Amino acid sequence: MSWQAYVDDHLLCDIDGQCLTAAAIVGHDGSVWAQSDAFPQCKPEEIAAIMKDFDEPGSLAPTGLYLGGTKYMVIQGEPGAVIRGKKGSGGVTIKKTNLALIIGIYNEPMTPGQCNMVVERLGDYLFDQGF
């Protein structure tokens, strides 16, 4: 299965009639493996800051999490494994695997819990596969 198929079929899937706004699979070095059309163009320093927060949990809290220039307030995640952000009625979930970051962006009416489930389910699967 191609990386794009993982984004299209597993991240942009329908959950109770809702769907992520945008999604991507990005390497730890910031290289995009696959992304949806609506996924923002991320800057290398944004991915570097996210990677730093996985190594040093809490480092993003004072400044916020940025994706494509959009700022998200960092909320409770799982240190070293999941970072979650909130902006207005939407937000982002980022799951770290051995080689990649699985990123899902949502807006209402999708809920944070639905976004977490979609992103973390694929992240756990890829982690178990060695990715």
Curated annotation (Swiss-Prot):
**Top-rank taxon:** Eukaryota
Molecular-function GO terms, alphabetical: actin monomer binding
Q: Which UniProt keywords apply?
A: Actin-binding, Allergen, Cytoplasm, Cytoskeleton
Assigned protein family: Belongs to the profilin family.
- Subunit text: Occurs in many kinds of cells as a complex with monomeric actin in a 1:1 ratio.
> What does the UniProt record say this protein does?
Binds to actin and affects the structure of the cytoskeleton. At high concentrations, profilin prevents the polymerization of actin, whereas it enhances it at low concentrations. By binding to PIP2, it inhibits the formation of IP3 and DG.
What is the protein name given in its UniProt record?
A: Profilin
